[in-house]
Amino acid sequence: MAKGGNVRVTITLECTSCTQDSVNKKSPGISRYTTRKNRRNTPLRLELKKFCPYCYKHTIHGEIKK
């Protein structure tokens, strides 16, 4: 039997270099990915290396608040 409520949540990952560049107005946009994570296994904020089409390279994408 399953215990508790929803352990898996949908999160949004945002490019960290695009968000820093958007302050200086260098990048045309901000890359965002959606994924799911298990809150029990990864209680901290998730950071993954993903491809950013605005930076044209693989960068670190961090979890953001909704």
UniProtKB/Swiss-Prot annotation:
Entry keyword NAD? no
The places in or outside the cell where this protein is found are: Plastid, Chloroplast
GO function term, MF aspect, one: structural constituent of ribosome
Keywords of the record: Chloroplast, Plastid, Ribonucleoprotein, Ribosomal protein
Origin: domain of life: Eukaryota
- Indicate the principal place this protein occupies in or around the cell: plastid
GO process annotations (BP): translation
Question: What Pfam families does the annotation carry?
Answer: Ribosomal_L33
Q: Give a GO cellular-component term.
A: ribosome
Gene3D superfamilies, per database record: Ribosomal protein L33 (2.20.28.120)
Q: Which InterPro entries match?
A: Ribosomal_bL33, Ribosomal_bL33_CS, Ribosomal_bL33_sf, Ribosomal_zn-bd
The record's annotation in NCBIfam families points to: PRK00504.1, PRK00595.1, rpmG_bact
Which PANTHER family would you find in this protein's record?
A: 50S RIBOSOMAL PROTEIN L33, CHLOROPLASTIC, LARGE RIBOSOMAL SUBUNIT PROTEIN BL33C
What family does this chain come from, according to its entry?
Answer: Belongs to the bacterial ribosomal protein bL33 family.
Q: What is this protein called?
A: Large ribosomal subunit protein bL33c
Q: What organism does this protein naturally occur in?
A: Cryptomeria japonica (Japanese cedar)
